[in-house]
Amino acid sequence: AAGEPTGVLLEKAVRLVESHLPVESAEEIRGALLEAQAEAHRLGLTGVHSVEVTGLEDFTRMELDGVLRLRVLQTIPLPRLEHAIGAGLRSGFGGEWLRIGGVKMFTDGALGSRTAWMRQPYEGGAAGDVGICTLEPEEFRDHVRRAAAAGIASTVHAIGDAAVEMAIDVLGGAERLPAMPHRIEHVQLCPPDLWARAGRSGLVGSMQPIHLMTDIPAAERHWGHERARGAYAFAPLARAGMTLAFGSDVPVESCDPRLGLFAAVRRVGWDGAPAEGWWMENAVTAEQALRAYTEGPAFAAGLPHRQGRLLPGYDADLVAWDVDPLDCEPDALCQMRCVLTMVGGEVVQRA
């Protein structure tokens, strides 16, 4: 604020140094992806929705070489939207292992850095301390229209309540595509007055329960307790009719689904506080959380008719645990052991 450099680069300022970062070779990237794939199988994951900028080329090579054994939905970075349109890419294009998702856009920053875009100032902040809007409404609307006209859905990062409201309004009013729905990533602060609008919007709420285990102290500090009533509002949004698709935001947090299930049900921090849970009216049951990790992502990927459920004719993507997650104490969810992971009828991990 005083015009002195702090050494911290917020949001778009990171572009000042991005071009100077060392570039990994194709072999290094493949090695890392194969390690990550094995770890995902060990944890009981059969698919991922990827937002990595270079992911499409790397996953394509793995698929062509027959080594990709995760169902991958790959988003298109906004700077590459025109290239994707020119190349004829559409949401839903692809094959057995790799498919095209939506165009990824960012409308704000994050909670911890106080750059998430807010309706009202942060706690203890000045009148203008409302975070950062990284995509102006008209520009945002134009990108969504342009993508939809080309058959590409939108996948939009929105954390603060102002960003979430804008995303609901713009995406909810956009052309709906047959391939897959538009989705809001994170939806971390969605106040009660937005719940019904979110439910009517037809949008997917792509949320990461594990974040709340880290964010509880930050939310209380930066948003205040009462405003935090709308934080990670899983149950109210589901009741309103919004389809929830749970994930992890790895590598920001662990991709271990057990931790996400636990967080969605118990709503406590890593230190176990508050013992009674944080805004428990927003908690979901273990069954609701499990559906949000299975049926939700399948719906978000435009594949509710062939993935996300154990039914005849569906892809044989399944996981076996040593205990029933629907018949154990919430605290036991973190200790479950994945004893088998199957993708496409092939056992890819057995404990």
Q: What do these predicted ranges mean?
A:
Residues 63-66, 88-98, 177, 198-202:
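Acidic (Asp/Glu)-rich catalytic clusters
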Residues 1-86, 101, 105, 110-163, ...:
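Divalent metal-binding segments
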Residues 61, 83-87, 111-118, 167, ...:
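Short acidic, glycine/serine/threonine-rich loops at helix termini
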Residues 144-155, 162-182, 186-187, 192-196, ...:
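His/Asp/Glu-enriched, well-ordered alpha-helical/loop segment
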Residues 325-332:
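Short, Lys/Arg- and Gly-enriched loop/turn segments at beta-strand edges
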